[in-house]
């Protein structure tokens, strides 16, 4: 047993405490991090990391990862590698980093799978979900892996994340409706660990328990709704999650909707005229009426980009209000500073000639902004624009770039369009398209960890 490093670290801490010297101290680094003093934390972690202390290397790498800066992300990968031999946790975090990386190579994907597998074998149970997602999204990289067989083995061994992975597989394979009983059983068991199970349970009850939707005192709903609201009051569940559950309950496409229960939930988290109410009435008119929503929009507190976006959608789609593309454009322009989807709608207005003529450059600019903000539908629209050439010169290489990006983001109807573009793409244009795709991915994913991915990595 090697006691040298712990003894040295203890000695350094003692010297710091007694002599008030500015020597590296892991305890001080953690305290500084807790109070938001990242410079002090980074200085202590870095000095200790350079001396070979594994925990300090992990602390430094976590800080580099959380920064979101492209250069710091590259350094985080290097720092995690410093700790690989001594720490299964380092393998887990580097594996997740590589697995979540949008521009990862085939070699990096295989390395991620190996690291996550090694970490799991060493007792890091939190890697199962990212490992399953890696296999699910990259079947061509892992042709010999039977994900369902792996999940069956993990579930038989009692690993909680395997249950959640199973639900994702059901959704991805289009077999969700065939496994409602299994999903209900999983989520009843995993509510405390995975709050997203509240949404799944609401979906299951609407689809499989039609009699429940009109029985307010039904035991099945009490098992889901009341713990959800209690968890929200205790700070364990976000208002966003409650809103999502309310949206499920209000959706008639999932079953016999229950708008009254949805209203009761929303009244607790966001009394009218909160923005969640405006959106809910727009998407599911059963929770209100046009006059009620417009009244909410007229409130002084509604003078915000989200309200402008919703008004733009009302005039754009002609839903609840007469269609008026000019008014839609006006409201989308007001909203676009902070509402990314406003750029998408503007791009569609300009692309489709809703204002009386096509504005191709405005369409490209708006759609590209939306696409780079994470809107897969904008990538698909750009692929259509460049492949069809309405008001713009046909450019199949550009069309290939955006069709590929739409496919990578999981837009289901983009695959047929991509295949059609490929069939008409000359070899030289294919090469140019690949080069432009790489450049666009670098521009888009220079900071390639989204806030959601970063949070997922840190929570898992």
From Swiss-Prot:
Gene3D superfamilies: Tetratricopeptide repeat domain
Pathway(s) it belongs to: Glycan biosynthesis; alginate biosynthesis
Endpoints of the signal sequence: 1-17
SUPFAM superfamilies, per the entry: HCP-like
Organism of provenance: Azotobacter vinelandii
Keyword list, A-Z: Alginate biosynthesis, Cell outer membrane, Lipoprotein, Membrane, Palmitate, Signal
Record flagged with keyword Nucleotide-binding: no
S-S bridge residues: none
Disruption phenotype: Cells do not encyst.
GO cellular component: cell outer membrane
Membrane topology according to the record: Lipid-anchor
Family of this protein: Belongs to the AlgK family.
Example GO BP: alginic acid biosynthetic process
Chief localisation class: membrane
Residues bearing a lipid moiety (N-palmitoyl cysteine): 18
This protein's name: Alginate biosynthesis protein AlgK
Lipidation, S-diacylglycerol cysteine type: 18
Species classification: Bacteria, Pseudomonadati, Pseudomonadota, Gammaproteobacteria, Pseudomonadales
């Amino acid at each position: 047993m090697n006691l040298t490093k712990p003894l040295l670290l203890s000695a350094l801490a003692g010297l710091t405490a007694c002599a008030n010297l500015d020597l590296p101290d892991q305890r001080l680094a953690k305290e500084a991090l807790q109070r938001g003093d990242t410079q002090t934390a980074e200085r202590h972690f870095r000095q200790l990391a350079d001396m070979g202390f594994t925990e300090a290397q992990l602390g430094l790498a976590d800080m580099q990862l959380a920064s979101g800066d492209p250069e710091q992300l590259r350094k985080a990968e290097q720092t995690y590698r410093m700790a690989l031999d001594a720490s299964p946790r380092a393998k887990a975090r580097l594996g997740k980093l590589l697995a979540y990386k949008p521009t990862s190579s085939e070699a990096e994907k295989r390395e991620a799978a190996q690291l996550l597998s090694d970490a799991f074998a060493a007792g890091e149970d939190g890697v199962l979900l990212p490992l399953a997602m890696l296999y699910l999204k990259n079947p061509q990289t892992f042709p010999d892996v039977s994900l369902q067989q792996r999940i069956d083995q993990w579930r038989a061994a009692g690993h909680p994340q395997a249950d959640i992975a199973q639900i994702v597989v059901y959704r991805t394979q289009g077999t969700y409706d065939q496994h409602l009983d299994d999903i209900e059983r999983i989520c009843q068991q995993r509510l405390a660990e995975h709050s997203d199970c509240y949404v799944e349970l609401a979906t299951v009850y609407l689809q499989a328990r039609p009699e429940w939707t009109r029985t307010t005192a039904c035991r099945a709903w009490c098992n889901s709704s009341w713990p959800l609201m209690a968890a929200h009051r205790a700070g364990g569940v976000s208002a966003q999650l409650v809103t999502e559950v309310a949206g499920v309950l209000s959706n008639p496409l999932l079953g016999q909707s229950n708008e009254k229960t949805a209203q009761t939930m929303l009244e607790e988290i966001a009394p009218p005229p909160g923005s969640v109410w405006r959106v809910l009435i727009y998407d599911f008119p059963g929770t209100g009426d046009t006059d009620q929503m417009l009244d909410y929009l007229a409130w002084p507190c509604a003078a915000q980009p989200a309200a402008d976006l919703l008004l733009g959608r009302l005039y754009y789609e002609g839903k609840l209000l007469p269609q008026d593309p000019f008014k839609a454009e006006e409201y989308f322009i007001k909203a676009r500073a902070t509402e990314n989807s406003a750029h998408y709608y503007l791009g569609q207005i300009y692309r489709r000639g809703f204002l009386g003529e096509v504005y191709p450059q405005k369409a490209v600019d708006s759609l590209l902004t939306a696409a780079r903000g994470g809107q897969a539908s904008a990538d698909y629209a750009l692929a259509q624009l460049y492949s069809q050439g309405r008001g713009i010169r046909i450019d199949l290489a550009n069309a290939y770039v955006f069709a590929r990006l739409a496919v990578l983001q999981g837009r289901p109807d983009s695959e047929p369009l991509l295949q059609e573009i490929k069939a008409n793409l000359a070899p030289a244009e294919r090469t140019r398209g690949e080069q432009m795709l790489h450049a666009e991915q670098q521009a888009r994913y220079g900071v390639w960890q989204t806030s959601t991915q970063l949070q997922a990595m840190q929570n898992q």
